[in-house]
């Protein structure tokens, strides 16, 4: 088979340009891929101690993780009386109210600190009869501390089974880590475009001066499974030369913390389809998830975790790493916006084009397209 025919064969799994703008297809994606897929809600480190709560920013704070005596639970954060939001952000339930959930508007009180079902209405001032309106409680499943909502209809993914064969699970261990920050990043392009950029290393050298001098794709290793892929890349030049001032600061902080010794990898990037990404960097773990808002708007939520001692004592390390991460994120935005702008231009003139995959640097993108076509039956 000639190189040209191989390229043409490879390109057959690419998606048509209309797939990034079509409202009907987008609605079907939400139902088929997201509603019945791995429904990530947050990490248990957001509520490490009993009495902690964390409202979900990706859901306009409409639900909350609460650490009760029964464990970490997910409840509605909307009062059953006048539908007001109850809890705000991250914090601790007020011990003055017995550690229960209390709406500040009219003092409706819901159980969260005793054997009664969490979210059960236990107080409604000035009502002669109990309204019997409880907060909804949503069952959870857990993998490596990542919390996923169980699908009430009995469908959806078995996360533990999907990720059972994951090679670098030990590197993605959150033991001894703490959540430092949650970043919400709005992307003006299709969610699939985000995943495509994430799953190809072809652009790292040309488009990421900072990241491209921090990691090297010369020793890129892929791990593929039915519902996930993993990229592992090495350290560039023993971190001897930074490609941007922001990465210079990050590399200096990293080498200072490590007494000048380079790490074993540059990065590990896990993608659990369709939208969960767990990332390893030296002394850093992140969970990045996509929450589609429309065919051309996507919310990216990034949670930054570090060893507890770094969170407590190494603020310069934390700030330098997050600045480097966000520099790369902004560069990825430009790539994705250019791609979708080109697709829109092709669609406007009634044309459809796609190019070949570069192997091995775009193998992940090809697997994602094949996974998408199978799941969506297209």
Language model regions located:
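C-terminal catalytic domain of Rieske-type non-heme iron oxygenases
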Residues: 66, 76-77, 139-141, 146-378
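Short Pro/Gly-enriched beta-strand edge/turn motifs at strand-loop
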Residues: 36-41, 120-123, 269-274
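Short linear motifs in intrinsically disordered
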Residues: 41-47, 129-130, 265-269, 303
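Generic structural signal for secondary-structure transition and capping sites
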Residues: 34-38, 84, 203
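Short, contiguous pre-domain boundary segments
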Residues: 3-17, 175
